[in-house]
Amino acid sequence: MILAIQLFYFGVSDPWLDFVVPSIQFSMELCSEAPHYDNDWPSDITVWVNGLEIGTWTSPGDFGGRRGKLNPAWWPDLSTQFGSLKTWRVDETRSTLDDVEVSTTTLQQLSLLSNSFIGMRIGVKENARFKGGLNLFGKRFGDHEQDMVMRIYYML
């Protein structure tokens, strides 16, 4: 069961809350980066969490040719317009990209509960096959009305 707690209060007899984290997820709209735009401009975009690689997506291009649904009027037509909405997820057994396994990195390996922060990095590796850069869209650009989102799923 996944709970979205809006308010939780503690009394003297129960001064803490125990929870289990079964997965963590990162969702974002992104694409390659080329001069102006180029729909055929692949880029190997990798995500790391706490220094561990969780998976790479090969973006097929830097998308243009039509306006992004959310782009402001002042944004030039010949620039990057939109991306693809991608979701990386790490659970107790594997890492996935859009529900397809991309690595064997697990939640336990990320040491989420023993660190004072969660470090997330997105980029293109120096030794990537396709080094086409990247565009990362917020909720007012592209086609998907969302900023980059990190979700930590938990169970009580």
Model-derived segments and spans:
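Proprotein-processing/basic-patch segments
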Residues: 123-156
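Extended, solvent-exposed segments with strong compositional bias
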Residues: 1, 60-113, 129-132
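Short beta-strands within extracellular/lumenal beta-sheet-rich domains
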Residues: 2-20, 100-106
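Short coil-to-beta strand junction motifs in C2/discoidin
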Residues: 37-49
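Beta-strand elements of well-folded, non-transmembrane domains
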Residues: 30-34, 51, 124-128
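A short beta-strand element within beta-rich, extracytoplasmic domains
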Residues: 20-39
